């Protein structure tokens, strides 16, 4: 007899049998879901992803991919403190997600206006004893990062991190070994083949077609910097903290960052700034990047000579360079005098300090307010050497005080900045590089820096040293570093005499800005070549450097805007630097021949008829209308934004004195205000006014060889309204028509040029106006054949349409000086120096009375500048 149990009883029995199986399976499924997390960039189909994994032993690893390729293999992460070891035995608690978008502006760098977007995931874990660890992961479309957050309160000691990066052992690597002041030499190797050592950050790795630049950012005195520790044969690089860390909770550690993608994406990355703390300086109007004349490298003893430093000030004034750095050796007895001397010439002074003189709060309270009272614009602080927590706390104090005093800062002999320039924007430069002062063969070395050190922050390389004989680079390579290397204070390290012996180099250096609106990598490879395009306003500069054999570089110009552009290239020629121009469009290709270990710079600016240079030329002085004979005037010497500029009798006052800046602005009141198209409008009749300089398109002006002053944004010319010629006629922009109401001359030097040695004037014999006529010395008589004007374009003209020139554009001593039809060549460009010499920009030599003659009829020539009485002229 069989017994059939009731159906309900069978169901209960089956449930009892299956339930334990369910209890086993479900927790296993939950654990699997919780042990791996992926964070992708914010855009649809983002190519970048970060992966965090919790392993069976409670350890964490971090990995990253780009375009579907694993770039950073799983590597240990975690942190150890005096309270807990948060590198192992971790248990997952929870996950939270958000999207982070930011816009911010930098005062320096490869791109002043920044926009960034990240996906952020916070993964919370508990460790032994219930200690809490949050791992915050961010992914953008071009990089990944993570940091640790430790909640709680009270003090804690950080004893180490497990943070590391792993790449294939065969990956190409570019590393810099530890060296005092971060001045080691970058070298190429493989990730596994690098010697056992610690290495500075950043470090660059190539994995297939992808690159990863690993670094850290958002570092201050709450923590310490780290090196990358590596064992030969391993492909893992682990963070090794510089000294002990005692800090307080809650704690957010610095970000461990990796810029990912192709070489252009990594080079153009701003991840170090994007993840740094926002600016602590609300008003940054006083922070002004610029070109600096610096004497120490070319003549070590010169900073102790006030007289020599004044010569550097004069040089900076002549060339529109904004700053002079007085290095070790200055004396407080004469610094106030030279600051006043420089200020009167539109030049600002930077002073060098040994960090030991600013080590304590008392020392800083003594010196920093003092130099501010002297009128010094900023300080260069040297010999800092390391980034331990006590040193970072010293940085915090210095940065807060210099911001409060409105002193700009350059840290020299320093470790690599790690986000400092965003948080403290008065830091316009930092060294942390094996720069020009090392006097080494460095063509290949130079081509690594744009992809590594200079990605992270502004780099004070002190470039462009022609007089250095122990180098393997050409002159054009030296010149090109002024564009390829970025620094908010670009310290050009040669002497005035050396630069003025290279006029083609000054053609570029005199117009370069020190901060950029946009940067693009056009091509290159670390250790071989680097080609970058940088934009400021409406003009571009392409700089290229190479190592190895001669080559021809070609690149499409598709990044240009519409219309015609003047491409002005300076490169190596058979007899030194050579200059060539070409009119191009964005459909053309730039092609430049490079010498071995050579380079080039190409300036690209909107083209107007007759242009042959992009250089904003001319000295400070009045703009005089050729039709009216009146000068561009700010009525009533007003400094109020929006005051419309008008014609008025020329009086030589500050409200009629205009200076062409290196970035194409026309400034008045020593650079305090700019000539501005009202509202940035482009229509005929738009008022031209003064306004705070803001680098906008409405403040850009290009000078044509015909004397027109063109706003490239509108394509319109500076114009006297209604063709007026009476005082009070307002100025506007109008369609360029070549009329006399659109033609301007620099009116700061009308009249005769009288020789100091002879007492006689520069004269055209018999009033001869024919091209080729040679001027001579003659008794001063005030005639039109002795009346010379300095044009906006830098020419010395006579009879309105003849220019003083070096015959045939020659540059040798003894070259005849003559008049010729004005053609905007450098043989017709002259600069009147403060010592009374008149320098030809094509040759760098001086207007000279032949054989030091003083008699009537003595002819003029070019000759090496020597300051003799036959080369000194006064204007009357």
Language model regions located:
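Carbohydrate-binding surface patches
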Residues: 525-563, 600-603
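Glycan-recognition and catalytic regions of carbohydrate-active enzymes
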Residues: 123, 497-541, 573-581
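An acidic-aromatic substrate-binding cleft motif
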Residues: 251-323
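Aromatic- and carboxylate-enriched substrate-binding clefts and catalytic-loop regions
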Residues: 329-474
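Secretory targeting and sorting signals
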Residues: 1-33
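C-terminal beta-strand-rich structural cap/linker in extracellular carbohydrate-active enzymes
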Residues: 583-614
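N-terminal accessory beta-strand-rich subdomains and adjacent acidic, glycine-rich linkers
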Residues: 34-275, 577
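Extracellular glycan-recognition/adhesion modules and their associated mucin-like linkers
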Residues: 614-641, 654-682, 697-725, 740-769, ...
């Amino acid at each position: 007899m069989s017994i059939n149990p009731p159906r309900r009883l069978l169901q209960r029995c089956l449930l009892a049998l299956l339930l334990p199986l369910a209890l086993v399976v479900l927790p296993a499924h939950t654990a699997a879901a919780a042990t791996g997390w992926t964070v992708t960039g914010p855009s649809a189909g983002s190519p970048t992803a970060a992966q965090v994994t919790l392993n069976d032993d409670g350890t964490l690893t971090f990995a990253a991919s780009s375009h579907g390729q694993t770039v950073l293999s799983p590597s240990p992460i975690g942190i150890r403190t005096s309270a807990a070891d948060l590198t192992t035995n971790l248990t997952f608690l929870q996950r939270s997600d958000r999207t982070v978008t930011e816009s911010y502006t930098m005062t320096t760098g490869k791109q002043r206006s920044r926009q960034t977007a990240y996906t952020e995931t916070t993964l919370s874990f508990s460790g032994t004893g219930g200690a809490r660890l949050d791992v915050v992961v961010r992914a953008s479309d071009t990089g990944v990062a993570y940091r640790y957050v430790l909640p709680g309160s009270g003090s804690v000691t950080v004893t180490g991190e497990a943070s590391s990066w792993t790449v294939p052992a065969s990956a190409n690597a570019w590393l810099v070994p530890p060296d005092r002041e971060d001045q080691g030499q970058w070298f190429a190797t493989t990730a596994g083949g690098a010697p056992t050592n610690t290495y500075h950050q950043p470090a660059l790795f190539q994995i297939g077609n992808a690159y990863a630049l690993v670094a850290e950012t958002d570092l201050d005195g709450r923590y310490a910097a780290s090196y990358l520790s590596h064992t030969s044969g391993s492909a893992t690089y682990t963070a090794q903290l510089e000294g002990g860390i005692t800090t307080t909770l809650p704690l957010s550690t610095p970000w461990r960052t990796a810029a990912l993608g192709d070489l252009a994406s990594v080079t153009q990355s701003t991840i170090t700034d994007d993840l740094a703390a926002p600016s602590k300086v609300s008003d940054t109007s006083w922070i002004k990047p610029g070109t600096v004349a610096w004497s120490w490298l070319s003549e070590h003893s010169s900073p102790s000579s006030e007289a020599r430093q004044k010569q550097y000030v004069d040089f900076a004034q002549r060339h529109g360079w904004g700053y002079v750095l007085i290095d070790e050796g200055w004396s407080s007895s004469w610094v106030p005098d030279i600051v006043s001397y420089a200020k009167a010439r539109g030049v600002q002074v930077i002073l060098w300090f040994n960090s030991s003189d600013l080590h304590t709060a008392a020392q800083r309270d003594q010196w920093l307010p003092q130099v501010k009272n002297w009128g010094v614009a900023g300080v260069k602080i040297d010999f800092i050497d390391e980034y331990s927590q006590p040193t970072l706390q010293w940085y915090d104090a210095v940065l807060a005080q210099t911001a409060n005093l409105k002193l700009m800062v350059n840290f020299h002999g320093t470790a690599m900045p790690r986000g400092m320039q965003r948080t403290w924007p008065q830091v316009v430069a930092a060294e942390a590089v094996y720069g020009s002062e090392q006097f080494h063969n460095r063509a290949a070395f130079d081509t690594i820096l744009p992809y590594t050190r200079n990605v992270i922050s502004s780099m004070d390389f002190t470039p462009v040293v022609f007089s250095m004989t122990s180098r393997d680079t050409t002159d054009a390579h030296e010149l090109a570093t002024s564009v390829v290397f970025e620094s908010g204070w670009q310290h050009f390290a040669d002497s005035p005499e050396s630069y003025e012996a290279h006029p083609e180099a000054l053609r570029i250096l005199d117009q370069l800005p020190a901060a950029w609106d946009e940067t693009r990598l056009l091509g290159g490879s670390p250790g071989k070549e680097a080609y970058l395009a940088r934009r400021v306003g409406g003009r571009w500069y392409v700089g290229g450097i190479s190592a190895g054999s001669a080559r021809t570089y070609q690149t499409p110009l598709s990044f240009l805007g519409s219309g015609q552009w003047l491409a002005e290239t300076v490169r190596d020629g058979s007899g030194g630097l050579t200059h060539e121009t070409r009119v191009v469009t964005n459909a053309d290709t730039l092609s430049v021949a490079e010498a071995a270990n050579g380079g080039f710079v190409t300036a690209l600016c909107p083209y107007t008829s007759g242009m042959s240079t992009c250089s904003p030329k001319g000295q400070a002085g009045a703009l005089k209308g050729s039709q009216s004979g009146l000068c561009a005037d700010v009525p009533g010497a007003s400094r109020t934004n929006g005051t419309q500029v008008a014609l008025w009798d020329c009086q030589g006052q500050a409200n009629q004195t205009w200076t062409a800046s290196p970035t194409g602005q026309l400034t008045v009141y020593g650079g305090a205000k700019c000539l501005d198209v009202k509202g940035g409008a482009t229509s005929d009749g738009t008022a031209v006014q003064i306004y705070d300089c803001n680098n906008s398109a409405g403040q850009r002006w290009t000078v044509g060889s015909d004397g027109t002053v063109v706003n490239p944004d509108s394509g319109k010319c500076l114009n006297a309204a209604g063709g007026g010629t009476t005082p009070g006629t307002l100025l506007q922009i109008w369609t360029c028509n070549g009329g006399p109401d659109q033609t301007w001359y620099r009116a700061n030097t009308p009249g005769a040029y009288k020789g100091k040695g002879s007492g006689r004037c520069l004269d055209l014999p018999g009033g001869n106006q024919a091209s080729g006529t040679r001027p001579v010395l003659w008794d001063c008589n005030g005639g039109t054949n002795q009346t010379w004007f300095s044009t906006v374009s830098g020419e010395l003209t006579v009879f309105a349409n003849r220019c003083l020139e070096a015959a045939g554009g020659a540059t040798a001593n003894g070259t005849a000086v003559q008049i010729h039809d004005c053609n905007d060549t450098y043989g017709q460009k002259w600069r009147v120096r403060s010592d009374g010499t008149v320098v030809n920009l094509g040759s760098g030599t001086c207007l000279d009375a032949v054989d030091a003659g003083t008699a009537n009829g003595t002819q003029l020539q070019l000759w090496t500048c020597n300051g003799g009485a036959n080369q000194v002229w006064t204007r009357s």
